[in-house]
């Protein structure tokens, strides 16, 4: 059995936290292969989950095991941004959501080269890494600096699995019968201000709603107060509007989140995101059967298209969402994050007219959009089934740390133990 250290923000209420928990579940699916240890990290200012679920109990057991462990583990899986990865085990796999822009930083590419293998959550993230090429500051060939670049075999893509969650009714007071939904943090990347403002402008004189599950930094009362006032400013130019914007703020468990996707009055998920490494809320909405309106760029397009075979026998992809036109433009200055979102990177800027038209199309032709969403839901339930995702992790781990390597290591350890016994 291999000793495996899972390092990442596994207790945080964040995308990376959910990513770490997804990897934890994959490891748990093979107790015959993996002896799991957990080292939790923080993720920004996001809160930690301390509930007493069965999963959290197992996580805390693995944390306690880690605190008592001495020596070097066989393998580490590090669910973190690349510049936080370290070589702490015999073999090390870096796992990241990747990048939401069209360019990975030189620092990230170097860290990817310095670790044994990389796993990302989308083909978008993989392609961005492969296309981000720099000059190596150390390696020279024929008097020229060599390219610092990743090769396809150094990166694998493993997305999130579909979850089978119950729907916990929260008793929401939604007065409008037809409502859109968006889930986002109110920062530069999600472009939440445009989502809210353009919705309100399109449905100013109609009895239509938008449910916004959001925060700015955390789930505190102060955060809610600040976000509420910020959102009021986004729509203050629309005096006398009939449409409603509902703010949902605070901690929700997974059953409550899935209740939003399955609420009888919530009809469609919408976003004007600049870019996604994967887009977990979009994915959850899609596999819950909600129609989706989104720009057709970055990580979420992986799961919003259905794989099909054309009449000529060639593979193709069928879009099962309502596309929003966009332009790739340089990231805003307030979005630049050293060694993460670089100044020269670009991401998508949704077209206002196209977004409003997409909302209107869903509203007036809902039956056809719902049928399209049902087709996508059925595809994802098979394509992204939990068992398949778990198998992919096992396959990649075996590639990086083959079973025969482990068996030899274990055999040598047994010989050493026997020698000590005879001494």
Label the model's feature ranges.
Residues 5, 172-190, 196-199, 210-212:
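Conserved donor-binding/catalytic core segment of Leloir-type glycosyltransferases
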Residues 117-167, 407:
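Donor nucleotide-sugar binding/catalytic pocket of nucleotide-sugar-dependent glycosyltransferases
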Residues 216, 324-423:
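C-terminal amphipathic helix plus adjacent low-complexity
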Residues 291-294, 305, 311-316, 322:
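Short hydrophobic beta-strand element within catalytic cores of glycosyltransferases
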